[in-house]
Regions:
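DNA-recognition helix of helix-turn-helix
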Residues: 69, 76, 80, 131, ...
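C-terminal edge and immediately downstream basic/flexible tail or linker adjoining helix-turn-helix-like DNA-binding
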Residues: 9, 91, 122, 146-153, ...
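Amphipathic alpha-helical segment used for protein-protein interaction
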Residues: 8, 12-15, 87, 103-136, ...
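Arg/Lys-rich amphipathic alpha helix in sigma70-family domain 2
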Residues: 59-63, 73-93, 113, 165
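Structural recognition of an alpha-helix C-terminal capping motif at a helix-to-coil junction
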Residues: 31, 45-52, 65-77
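Sigma70-family region 2
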Residues: 11-12, 38, 51-66, 85-87
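Internal acidic/polar
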Residues: 89-113, 188-191
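Short, charged helix-capping/linker segments at alpha-helix termini
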Residues: 11-20, 30-49, 156, 176-180
Length: 196
């Protein structure tokens, strides 16, 4: 069943139709929240709040918009409100433990991949919230610039500019971290290198 059909049924009072929408989007909404707030427990709460808000305001949803865009907008607003109220940008957490490593990777390759993910998440947390959101929506969720502009407001051109700025800033953070590591290697790394 399509989102349009599920929304129409849910707006008519069909609770199982809304539950189907929740099942369809819960992983994406949780992943988005987790990347924005860096706390798996808070992300779960924010995902639940997102679906609660969607349920409460479902009758005001207009079918001329996409449900996916609308629910992402609610999730982004929930995350922004959380970040504003708590004024915190915690340490990055690999929230949903999505395995990005191939099945044939060696333990060394898997360790490097996990370390790279942690570095990227740490750099991502340094970005302004809007750039975090644009990058997450584009890369993780695969939204187009048009869809991002519908979720965050603004134009597709502004979404593209924010995305490009976010990538540029992210690269700068990652390069500066690499330079820092090269200038001040960890004692464990220095010990491993000296043994060879």
């Amino acid at each position: 069943m399509t989102d349009t059909q599920l929304v129409a049924r849910a707006q008519a009072g069909d609770l199982p139709a809304f539950e189907d929408l929740v099942k369809k989007y819960q992983r994406e909404i949780y992943g988005l929240a987790c990347r924005m707030v860096s706390d798996p427990e808070e992300a779960k709460d924010l995902a639940q709040q997102t679906f609660l808000q969607a349920f409460v305001h479902l009758r005001s949803f207009r079918q001329d918009a996409q449900f996916r865009t609308w629910i992402f907008r609610i999730a982004i607003n929930q995350c922004y409100n959380f970040l504003k109220s708590r004024k915190r940008f915690g340490d990055p957490v690999d929230c949903d433990e999505v395995v990005l490593v191939g099945e044939d990777d060696t333990p060394e390759e898997e360790l490097i991949s996990q370390d790279e993910r942690r570095r990227v998440y740490a750099a991502l947390k340094k970005l302004p919230p809007k750039q975090q959101a644009v990058l997450t929506l584009k890369v993780d969720q695969g939204l187009s610039y048009q869809e991002i502009s519908e979720v965050l407001g603004g134009t597709p051109g502004a979404a593209r500019v924010n995305y490009c700025q976010a990538l540029k800033t992210l690269k700068k953070y990652l390069r500066s971290e690499e330079d820092e590591v090269a200038m001040h290697p960890s004692p464990a790394l220095a010990t491993r290198v000296s043994r060879r």
